[in-house]
Amino acid sequence: MRRTVLAGLMAVSLTALAGCGFQLRGLNQPTLAIPELNLNANVSPFSEEVRRALENAGTRISETADIRLNLGDERISENRLTRSDSGSRETEVTLTAPFSVQRESDDAYLLNQQQLEASTTVLLSTDDIYSGEEVRNEAIRQLRRDAATQLIDRLDALETP
């Protein structure tokens, strides 16, 4: 009797967790059909985020790979959305980064002159500059993760021979 009650409670709790969006870490990680890739990029926080995303997607980074990913430098731009002189101001932060994908054997472009773009809106306080800078930096870190995920999605759609 006690065992069936415990099993029933366990089933109800797992259903409740799944219903509220709880997922085990790594369960729905994207996987790429590209087993190996040569990453050609300057060392930067964005290129490191892309490297991490590729490795998490099951792609090994190797200089001898058949496919080369050319990743340009990220560009961060900010656009003020509100015009108040004091207090808080709403700002749109946008990250853009160019990339292309080439075959190593003949340098043919599989994806040429592509652009990654991710943006978010943040509320920056003019009263507390430190917290505003922290909010901005966290937004940029999230944009890097979003752009890396966007790149994984584009590479996943790529048909490679």
Range-by-range predicted roles:
Residues 46-86:
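Short, solvent-exposed, polar/charged sequence segments at loop or secondary-structure edges
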Residues 54-58, 101-105, 150-159:
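Sec/Tat-exported extracytoplasmic proteins
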Residues 70-115, 121-137:
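Surface-exposed short loop/turn segments
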Residues 130-161:
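C-terminal/domain-edge helix-coil "capping" segments
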